[in-house]
Structure formats: C-alpha cells, structure tokens
Amino acid sequence: MNDGELREKALHLSSFIVEAPAGSGKTSLLTDRFLKLLTVVDMPEEIVAITFTKKAASEMKAKIIERIKESKSPFAQTILKRSEEKGWDIEHNLSRLKVMTIDKFCHNVVSQIPVLSKMGSKPNITDTPEKFYEESVKQTLQAKDGIEDIKVVFTHYDNEYEKINRRLVAMMSIRDQWKYRCNMLTQKSSGQIIEEGNAYLEHLTKPIYQKIRAELNQDQLNDLIEILHYLESTNLREDIKLKNKNSFNFDSEEIPLWQTITKILFTDKNTRRENITAREGFKNDDEGEIYKNKCRNLPNIDFLLAIKAIPEPLSETYALKLRSIANILLQCEKKLRQLFKQRNTVDFIEIIEIANEALGKNDAASDLLLSLDYKISHLLIDEFQDTSRSHFNFLKKIVDGWTPEAQKTIFCVGDPMQSIYKFREADVSIFIEAKKNGFNTIPLETIQLRDNYRSSSTIVNEINQIFENILPKEDLIQEGAVSYKPFVSAKKEHDSNVSEFKFHALTFTESTDIDTEEAKYVCNLIDTFPENEKIAILTRSRSHLSELINYIRKFKPTLKFNAVEIDALDKHQSIQDILSLSYAMLDLNDRIHWLAILRAPWCGIMLNDLALLFQNDHTSTVWEIIQDENKMSEISPDGRRRIRRLIDILKNAFDNQSKTHIRRLIESVWMNLGGELCLHNPNDIVDINKFFNILQTSSSPIAIDFELVEHQITKTYLSDIPSAEERIQFFTIHKAKGLEFDTVIIPSLNSTTRASDKKMIVSDTSVKNSRIFDITAFSEPDNKSPHLHDLIYGIEKSREENELKRLLYVAMTRAKTKLHLVGSVMHKDEIKPASNSFLSMLWNIYGNNFYEVKPIENIDIDIESSKIEEFVPKLMRLKLN
C-alpha cells in the first residue's frame, strides 16, 4: 500500500501504532483521526488526544477547530450534523474537545481526587523544583533519625559533604526511576541482595564463558591452568590464589581469575601482549620461557577483554551500603513530599505518581478509573516515542480492561528516530515494545509511512545516505538504539536548482580562537542568502549559540534575529527592576534595591538628583529621605514630580498590603508606575508574566522566598516571540523539534556538552530464558574498576550516544530547501574530531574534507559597528505628562 492508502486505513475504527519519519504530517494524520472519531462517538469527551508539550497541544486543538469550521469539508459537515443530533453544540462548546499534554491529563485526574492525592486541594505545578529538592536533602542529612545510614553513606563517600549533597539532589529529579527499587531493597536481606547480584553477574559473564569454551579446546584450557599454577609458584603476583584448582568452573567466583588472565595476555591498551616479563609474573629463565611461549601460542581471544568490566562477586559490605543508600534516598523523597504538601506545590514527577496511585494499586481499578473508563473510549497519543515509563504505566491503567470488541481504540503516532528526550526520562524502547506486544491488552497494528512533505529530494537523499551509516540496521532495545528507516521526498519541486546541501569543513591554525572565527564564517554564510529567506541556526546547547549571538549583536547589528529561550529571565533588565521593587517593598531598610527602583525606567530619577538626596545621609532609609521635604527641595522639579508620583502609588499599596496577595500587590504597583509602557518590546510582557507566576509560586500571601525566586529566574528562559522582520532564528535542536525552515545552518559540529554527573544509584533490568534480572548498584568514590555501577552506567552511556545520533537527525530534518553543516577543527599533528560530538559521527563520511583545505588563521568579515552602545539593550525612560 502507498502512503495515501495507509493514511486512509489509519482512520478505520481499530487500534494502530503509526511510525512515520520527520516531515510526514504525523500531527495532521492524528487530527484527521480525531475528526473521524467525532463522527461516531456519543460525546466529544470520549476522545482524548495527548501530546507532550503545551505548544503541540494548542496547535493540534487549533487545527481541529479550524477543520470543524470549514463549512465545505465533508468531515465538518458530518461532525456538525452529529453535534446537532446529539445536542453537543460543538461550535460554541469547543472546550469539550479534549486535547492536552500528558502532565495536564494527570493533573486533571489528581484534581478530581484531592483526598486521595494527599494534597488537600488542587496543587500548583512548578517547572523549577530544584529548591524543593535541595531543602528535602538538607532536612534529611540534618535529621537525627537514620543517623546510622547517614554514617555509612558518608564513610563510603569519604565524608565529601558537597558531593553527597549534590548527588542526592540530582537523584530527586529522577526519583520515579528508583523509588520502587529502593523500597524493594529495604525489604530484602543481605543474602538476597548478594544472591541476586551474583546471578546478574553470571548472566553477563555466561556469553563470555560460552565463547571461551567454543574458541579454546581442552588442551588450551589445560595450558592456561598450568600457566596460572606456574605464576602462583613464582610468588611474583599477589592476585592468583588457585587452591589446588585443576579446571575452570566458569562461574561468578572465577571472574577475578579471568580478569587476571586478561592482564597477563593483554596490555592496558587492550592489545595482545608481545613482551612478557617479570611484571606479569614470569621469571627470566628456561622454565619461564616455556610458559611465555604457552601464552603466545594461545589463539586470538580478544572477546575475553569484555570480562574486564565485570566486577567481583558482591559481599555483605556491599549489601549493607546499598541498603543504607536506599534508605537515605527514601528519606529524602519522604521529606520532599512533606514540603510539597506544605507549599501545595508539586513537580511533574509527583503529579504522575499521584495519578498512578489514584488509579489503583496492584492493578486493582479504583472507582475513579471506572469513571474515566466510562468517559474515555478513544485515546490518541502524539509523539509516542517521547513516552516515559511513568507515563506509560499511567496510560496503561487508563485503558485497563479495554478490549477491541468494546469499540475502544488506541492510536499512537511517532518516529523513534526522533526520540531525543532522555533527560525527561523518555524511553524509546516503549515504542518498540508496543509495536511488538501491543498497548496493555490492546493489540496495535503497525502502519509504516515513508513520504516526507517537508524537505527537497536533494536534502532527503543526503540525509538517507548519512544516517544509513550512523544509525544501526536493527533495533537494540537494551542500548536504546533504533534502526534507520529511509524515507522519500514527496515534495513537488518547481526549481531543483534552489535546493542545496553543503558540508563546510574549516581547519584553523593552533593560535586561532575557533569559536570567534566560526561565528564570522557563519555571519558571512548568512550574507549569501536572499534577504527574504528565513534562516534557522540550530545547535546542541545554548552555550554553542552564545558566541555567534554575541558577535552578531556587537558587530552585525542590522541582522535582525530572535533567539528562542536562549537567555534566562535574570538577564532581562525589566525583570531585575521588578525584582528590586519586590525586595524594596518588603524591606524598607534595603537601600540598594530602593535606589534601584528610583533608577528604574518607570521612575527615572537622574543620577544628579540621587547624589543630592543621598550623598550626605547614610543612616536614614530611602523611604524616609524621599518623604523629607527639605531634602526633596534640593533636587530638580522633574525629580520631585517623579518621586511624589512614586510615593503616592507606594503609599496606596502599603495601605492595602494586608488585604492583597503579595504577587498581586507588586504587580499592581508595577503597572501603576507605568512598567508596561517602559518595555522596549511589547512581547516582553510574556516574560514579565512568567516572573509574576514565579513570584506567585514562591510566596505566601504576605512573604516571598527570594532565594527560590532568584533560583527560578536563572532556570526560566525568555520567550523571544519572533516578529516578521526577524529573518534569522536561533534555537537549540530540542526547541526546534516539530518546526521547519527554508534554510537550516548547523554550526558547532565539533562542540561537546559537559558530561553529566554519575548517578548515585543505577539499575538495569534484562530478561534471559524467562528469568528477569533486576539489579541496582551504587557509585563508588574512586576511579578503581571494575564496579557494578560502572558496568550498568556503561549501558546508560550507550543509550545517550544513540540518542545523540538521533538529535543530529532531528536537526537536519528541519530543512526544507537548504541545509548547511559547519564543522571546525584545529590543525595539529593529527586532525581529528572531539569525541561525543556531531562531527565525530560524520567523520567517516566527511573527515577527508578537512585534509583538503588550507588551515585558516583569520576570517575576513565586514564589521558594521563596534560601538559598545550597539551592544547594550535599550531602555525607555517613562515620560511624565
């Protein structure tokens, strides 16, 4: 079947999972499905469409509404007829169309059950819960209960308080991953933990042992035993204790012995050892030479190197430490829940957990679940590859008991090749599992689309050639790897000459500032495009954009651009002014912030007036001084008018302070002072509202937690809504997902991001021959290896590396007609890319390009202005009538 026929099939009243590449119109298909279902349901609320971002939810709902209002559309006519028959009045009751984020859906569930939710009322949701995490850890470490566990943890981590504190705080942000496991650990004996851990090690070593027995015959195994007995007799090694061993048992107890064998046969660089000496335990005599030759005569057994990563069998001490760490983590989680309840605030993890609890424990359906089941008949999930385990468990409970015969359907749409939200706990293996096993009890028929309606054939062909070499040939669930599925361009091209793909290889001399020179190169590249062409510049992280943005601001000010969520709120002068107003209103003695509000644009006192008022009085408060008529008579008439206006507004606010929530009080003062009139860009009001929302969630009716406010404004980013005149847009790749642009430039290919801290505990679950291996390990304070934690963490790193490949795929598939990749390297003795960079993935394809170009020392560019005033954001001083 072609794509058109498959899209038609996807509208049938059955359950499907649709796998479709970038630019294939997935959201449009889901919209069609929603509209089709509206023609058969009894109530619109029976259909629930779920996305993972507010933006996607609002866009999808807007599309559905637009289609319903298309009077000539067959869908619209049928839906409106159904609406009239059933009394929906859908045209005037658009809120009955249930399109929302997964977090909003969970929140709605929780809001129906305030008693079960343990919150008492509908909680606020915070996007920046870090301060809650920090406080919960602080309270746990200062508590008297659990002191023995705290001692064990601190002893294990060498009493490094800062490191322990930082890692515990980090664990709070992923507590849904470990809470269940930690609860289970605290109920197990040391013997159980040791037995399960060693069984896991045997599970990992079994394939290595099988390979040894397949590659080495009995004579060669006997030679190895003889070599070991000889080395034990020389007393030159301390790591061989055979105890009359005459054969190999191939069990977990032998892991250290096989690791010793790898040290004897291989160098630290994992190459076969040619020069065997006394360092390996061999004497320099005839007998020693015999056993050296036995080593040399062994066949190629490089596969044995894998056993180097296997740790020694677990011990009683290990089990004790693991339980203590689990207890501390659970105490932190308990304190966090108490803090959430006190503040009536939760994070997204808490919402999903409360929702899961509310929907029944131990798979028993609660009354609420039965109620929801009655209401919901069709579940549609967009971007299904971004689902986390917690979300998936929640959704499975929603559809618990559904059967195909009941005319209830599930419709999942997504592209595993665009799964890039691991940092939000998205698990791409869920998509793969659902294709294979269905959604809970509902089997899903797979629909595979191939057409791309976004990109030109030139770009599609290049992307296919690149990613067929980068992504694997088959899905590897444990490693979080998804196979590459080529797609085809369905775009009608009027002029194929307009489309282009180019890789820019830049090699610089050692003395060059690569970031600055690459920024110049990209500026020159932008100048080559027509002025009416929209350009997107995409990078892995915000920091990769900073040099280019600063360069344009300073030297190319005529290039109009917007940078989407690149700068934090605390970088916005208007936000700083409102923050000063907040500090000042709650503390009359805060001289610095009172002076700041006098200088703010909505007050606008000149420096000369400030000097006259305050230079001789360092003890009175600012509030007292500005109400002193003698001192006020010394300043300019304009200054007096401005200050008297400020006093009138503040006096009114202070009189009503006890009657109004502090957020509303400060917001009304700012508005009355003319704060909105002083904004340089009218769109700035969006970010001002973000600040006031932070103030709301960080305050009681009469007080503000300023430490929390200051923290949150560093973690919340400016919106920068694009205007028509801004032809250049800067995005991180994650922010650009779902968007498309005429021209895409991907610079900083050789840049990397900071490695994440090791998690305090990690877990792995694998199934072999119907046996489930579920293991948890804790991190070690030193770099000695191997550790069980490092072994499992290695699997985690593989998943991150595979996601990084998909991130590049997402970036490249944003382009419609032009795609430019820019990579820069330093010319040294050896030209090579940075590990864990986009360029390292592309090196096998484009690496030779860097050897074919002459090293650059400096790139010429036409600088428009270097005046510092062009670099400083403009402020507007309020004009008094």
Range-by-range predicted roles:
Residues 21, 167-346, 520, 546, ...:
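Conserved ATP-driven helicase/translocase motor core recognized via long
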Residues 1-117, 222, 234, 243, ...:
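P-loop NTPase Walker
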Residues 1-62, 66, 131, 135, ...:
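Conserved motor-region signature of P-loop NTPase helicases/translocases
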Residues 756-795:
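Conserved catalytic motifs of ABC-family nucleotide-binding domains
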Residues 548, 566, 795, 800-812:
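Anion-coordinating catalytic cores for phosphoryl-, nucleotidyl-, and glycosidic chemistry
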Residues 97-107, 156-177, 325-331, 346-351, ...:
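Core structural elements
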Residues 616-649:
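Accessory alpha-helical DNA-binding modules that contact the DNA backbone or grooves
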Residues 2, 11-18, 51-52, 68-254:
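Conserved ATP-dependent motor core of P-loop NTPases, especially the RecA-like helicase ATPase domain
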